[in-house]
Amino acid sequence: MRLPLVARKAEPDPPGVRSQFGWSFSPRSDREAGDAIASNFAYHAFPAKVSKASMAWNYSFWLGTVSAALFFLLILSGLPLLFLYVPSVERAYQSVKDIEFVITFGSWIRAVHRISAHLMVIAVFLHLMRVFLTGAYKNGAGRGQHREWNWVLGVVMLLVTLFLSFTGYLLPWDQLAFWAVTVGTNIASSIPWIGPTVRELLIGGRTIEQATLIRFYVLHIVILPLGLGVMFAYHMWRVRKDGGLARAEQEALLEQPREAAITPTKTYTLLGVARGQAPVIRAQAIEAPETTVNAVPDLVRRTAIATLGTIAAVGIMAVFIASPLEEPANALVTPNPAKAPWYFLWLQEIVTDTTIHLGSFTLNGAFVGGVILPGLLVGLLTAWPWLDRSTRLATGVWFARVRARQNAVFLLIVIGILILTFVGTAMRGPYWQLYWPWEAWPEIPARI
């Protein structure tokens, strides 16, 4: 006699096992940890397991997470500014002044936005440095990896980040913004034959005016953020597709694959294995329980700490560091000296000293220092994964011996950029003369 089926009531989880956020602080099994990812859309960015080594704070310094948190802060702080700012040469400055001095918490929101923009440039650059110095752009032991293309995308994302900050620089429409953008766009005009056309396309005319402001405004609030968001999503998908951080590759390469115990009575008819036999399963070290942890909750927890820590740090900094607002933009009064944004000051410094005379032929310093040299640097940086001949054992290793020479050259270039940036920021005075940081500048009126 067949007994009737009786529905059994599911037993509730013990108190404290699952949190209201949809994941467990202490999962009872790997399956429960994996189910948290499968059942929550927000956690789909995380793999089921991650390498313990790649979780270390001192390996990646979580610079990618910090960069993403700063991008989120830029969007969050930019939304109220979007409703308050007026992109008009007649009203832009006054609307920013109202945000700064009239709107409740307006000064703090603007400071958060500005600090986040500057810190994002630094964080993305440091993230790129970390990837280079660890050789994380090289493929490891896994099949189907394309880390080199993710590196190329990272270089493009750095350039977009710089341009995103540069387009926002003009929006306050004060003297600092107007002349910084003037200096920056003048470098583009130094390209032979096409330079003036490139500059006109960039600023919408021959002078910086209403068309320039509208172009920079649309680029800053729509096109560049959307493009950067799409690239970030693909970048993270590619990281997961390539097996996570390159540090995990070291564990897979240094440890020999282990053979699973053979159970002669096991059968897998779907695979065509004959009865009485069993396949030999080889597991890489990255898959071993002793070298991995569950992404939920370990990776999620550390991601939350890095994100919230970044947001808190920026919020506190914005209390003490106000955003500057100088006099309204005036094309007839040139500040002395007129400087590019700080992240382009190293280029302005090179431009000053790179005019080359070859007989009757003269190479413009703006073209040499502002186009040729940075173009070569970006080109080499982009192509380096294919030029680097180091072994896979150097992948994911800080300052690997086989990469000592290229790391040294890379660091020398970075140090040179930092020195030039410092000189341009702290040591250039009126008429672009050199002064010690503690030395007073002479009283020289602005150029009219």
Q: What residue ranges belong to the model's regions?
A:
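Aromatic-capped, Gly/Pro-kinked transmembrane alpha-helices
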Residues: 30-34, 48-59, 63, 312-448
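Hydrophobic alpha-helical transmembrane segments
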Residues: 66-76, 114-129, 368-385
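Membrane-interface interhelical loops and short amphipathic "cap" helices
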Residues: 53, 81-112, 169-216, 322-364, ...
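Membrane-interfacial loop-to-helix junctions in multi-pass inner-membrane proteins
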Residues: 52-68, 133-158, 175, 179-183, ...
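Cytosolic juxtamembrane amphipathic/interface segments immediately preceding
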Residues: 23, 27, 42-62, 106, ...
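Long, contiguous internal "core" modules enriched in hydrophobic/ aromatic residues
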Residues: 214-215, 219-223, 228-334
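Transmembrane-helix bundle segments that line or gate the permeation/cavity pathway
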Residues: 5-39, 81-88, 112-137, 151-152, ...
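Hydrophobic alpha-helical membrane-insertion segments
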Residues: 67-79, 155-186, 305-332, 412-426
